[in-house]
């Protein structure tokens, strides 16, 4: 949020990604910058950030390392749609999307 407020009015959008889980905090800031903390990921939805769940759960429970395998199936694509004014560069709308539902 701090970066969004700092850049408000200087950039069209501030979109983050790290946890791969889309946040429901999309908004237009006061000076015309669109903001969302985390857009989300594109990949297998029935997973832990794209990895098969079994090994991740085992590591979580035991603290022991293991080989992570990429998950397959139930693909989703997370995205954020930003509308902006071509003359000013300011955002006029923001909407989060999850395709494949």
What is the predicted function of each stretch?
Residues 56-101:
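A short C-terminal boundary segment appended to hydrolase-like catalytic domains
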Residues 1-70:
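Conserved beta-sheet core of the metallophosphoesterase superfamily
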């Amino acid at each position: 949020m701090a970066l969004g407020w700092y850049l408000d009015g200087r950039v069209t959008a501030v979109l983050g990604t790290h946890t791969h889980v889309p946040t429901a905090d999309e908004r237009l800031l006061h000076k015309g910058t669109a903001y969302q903390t985390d857009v989300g990921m594109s990949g297998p939805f029935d997973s832990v950030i794209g990895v098969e769940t079994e090994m991740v759960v085992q590591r979580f429970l035991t603290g022991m390392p293991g080989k992570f395998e990429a998950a397959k199936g139930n693909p989703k694509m997370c995205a954020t749609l930003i509308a902006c004014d071509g003359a000013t560069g300011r955002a006029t709308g923001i909407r989060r999307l999850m395709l494949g539902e």
